[in-house]
Structure formats: C-alpha cells, structure tokens
Amino acid sequence: MSFAARATPIHAIPREPGITTRDLSLWYGDFQALKNITVEIQRGLITSLIGPSGCGKTTLLRCFNRVNERYGYVRTTGEIKILKKNIYDADVSLIELRKSVGMVFQRPNPLPVSVYENVIFGKRLHSEPKDLTKSELDAAVELALTEVGLWNDLKDRLDARATELQLEQQQKLCIARLLPVKPEIILMDEPCSALDVEGTRAIEELMWTLRGRYTLVIVTHNMAQARRASDECVFMLLGELVEHRRTEDLFLNPRDPRTAEYIEGRYG
C-alpha cells in the first residue's frame, strides 16, 4: 500500500480555505507573468502547481509569502488571503507572514552551522534571547527533527555541521528548520529536483506525514510526482490558471483540452 493510501482520506479533512487569490496579476517590468489568477487552495491538503516552464507556477508560489517583492521591478494587483487575511493589507507584517508561510527551495540550503543551530535558527530570530531557555530549545529541536523523521539518525550528531549531511537529510533539515516557529503553510519549489529516487520517495512520504497539520503547496515538473504526492492539482499555462481539480480527476478526466495535451506530453 502506498504512503498516500495510508494517509487520512481527503474527505475526512474539513474543507476550509488556506490560501485564496482573487484576480491576482503580476508583472516583471512590462512582462505579465500572472493573469487574473483566482484560486482557492484547501487548508491541510497537498496541492501541486503544474505546467510547462515559464507558465507562472513558481511566480504564483512565491506570491504566497511575497518573496517576489525582493525584485524591485515587480508589480502586483489583486488579492491574496492567507487564512482569510489579505496579505497586502497595510497592517500585515512581512516577518509574521513568513513565519506563517515557510518555504523550501529546489536545492537544500542548510546554514553552515550545526544541525542544532539550523533547527532553532528561526526560533532564535523571532524571539527575545531572554525568553528562550536551553530546555525549550532542546525540546524544539527534538520535536522538529522527530516530525521530519531525522531524530533517531541525528540525535547523537546535533553538533555535526549540517552541510555534511546527505542531500536527503539536508532537505529534511530545511523543512525541520521551519517548524519551531509554527507555520500554517509550507511552500515547496521543486523540493526533490536535486535528489535521487530514494531521496525523492523519502520527501514525498514526509509530505504525506505533514499533511493535515500543515497546508503544503508544491511546484513540480514531474507529472508522476504530482499524481503520487498531491490531493489537488492546479494546471497553469502562459500565466493563466487553466484547471484546478482533485489530482486523480485532473489526470483521469481533464476538462480542458490544454490540460489533456500537457498531461499526455504534447508540449511542455
């Protein structure tokens, strides 16, 4: 039985929006990368963003924690609500937003310090030193590493340099680094692209383990991965949202011919 088959059935997770966009458009200079995207991503599920290169899926993912804004030539219109709050409201703190919406990148990017210091990096960053005790930090490290399945392997190596770990362990550690600040949403931009088959399988299994406690949104070019490792899929093309459905429905009975053409490998 697959790990997905052992996970909580989708109908057992209450339907509640985790991320909602309305008429979201984004320009890089004069180039429009997103065109009036309206989508509702369900809380507690795994949603894959799929489509050919340049379709806008990574741009959309990075809108959800406003990472795109680090580029000075970006303009955005429309609305994004995270847990029913518009993230473009004037009173929204980017620091608080990025605590709630963590991100994992294509290549593992552990800090060049110990495993222990990697895990508590965010907690130290967002807390006053006087508010943190050694026992609290120790507990946070154990809990986070347990959640990602690394505690048994690394509990005796917490002082080891994180960059010396295997790539799969590094990527799991990057996920663990998000957890002590209690995110609601975890964004993943092709998190398995640097991993081998076994590493990919391990990250996909971890995603199913985290599902329900967190909302996961993943960008992937791998159609088999999207089908194996997500509850719902959003298919994008040329900056537009073409189709958003439960994963099996989208793959078995796509409503839009463009979706069918992409799934069948006719372009992309």
Model-derived features with residue positions:
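Catalytic Walker B motif of ABC-type/P-loop ATPase nucleotide-binding domains
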Residues: I186-D189
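Conserved ABC ATPase signature
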Residues: A160-L165, Q169
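ABC ATPase "signature
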Residues: H244-R245
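Conserved ABC ATPase "signature" region
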Residues: E79-N86, L132-D156
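ABC ATPase NBD coupling module
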Residues: Y73-R75, N86-G102, G212, L250-P254
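The feature captures the beta-strand-to-loop junction immediately N-terminal to the Walker
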Residues: I50-P52
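ABC-type ATPase nucleotide-binding domains, specifically the catalytic core motifs of the NBD
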Residues: N68-G72, A90-V92, E117-L137, G149
